[in-house]
From Swiss-Prot:
Name by which UniProt lists this protein: ATP synthase subunit delta
UniProt main location, coarse: membrane
Bilayer topology annotation: Peripheral membrane protein
Intracellular or extracellular location(s): Cell inner membrane
One protein family per Pfam: OSCP
A Gene Ontology cellular-component term: plasma membrane
SUPFAM superfamilies assigned: N-terminal domain of the delta subunit of the F1F0-ATP synthase
Keyword Ion transport: yes
Amino acid sequence: MAAEDPSVSGVSGRYATALFELARDEKSVDAVKADLDKFNALLDESADLKRLVRSPVFGADTQLKALNAVLDKAGIAGVAANVLRVLTTNRRLFAVADVIRAFNALVAKYKGEATADVTVAEPISDKNLDALKAALKTVTGKDVALNVKVDPAIIGGLVVKLGSRMIDSSLRTKLNSIKHAMKEAG
């Protein structure tokens, strides 16, 4: 399965594939995904946790003790906790974000879903999110999960990445196009 999806490759892909197959066999795909998403959110929120995960300065024992404390406090257990411990023991914790991303890609494929990365200038309403999901479902023929990121630098509009396709209707891109057209004309 991993060879079919370019986002599921390398070391991260192997861990994600093994994790997915184990979760599928135990019929706990949704629970594992929820736990990994919870850990990913903690990683995004905590600079200290990011440093622990990324820095080679911390030994495996130190990382494992800290990770166990985080997992206990967050209520992450079972298969998801075990794979995080294995990553730590094998000195691969730095790849956890890629493992989670690859696992989510495998889950989406398993469920017949597609995942789109959406960048907006300001938070988008639920009504508009639902309309965007419906439009993307019409195009892809699949249910579409959205990963929404707010980036004020795009000024307005949105950027949608779905697989190898990208739709950029941001105001920043339109202004850059006008700027280039004016440079060529003048």
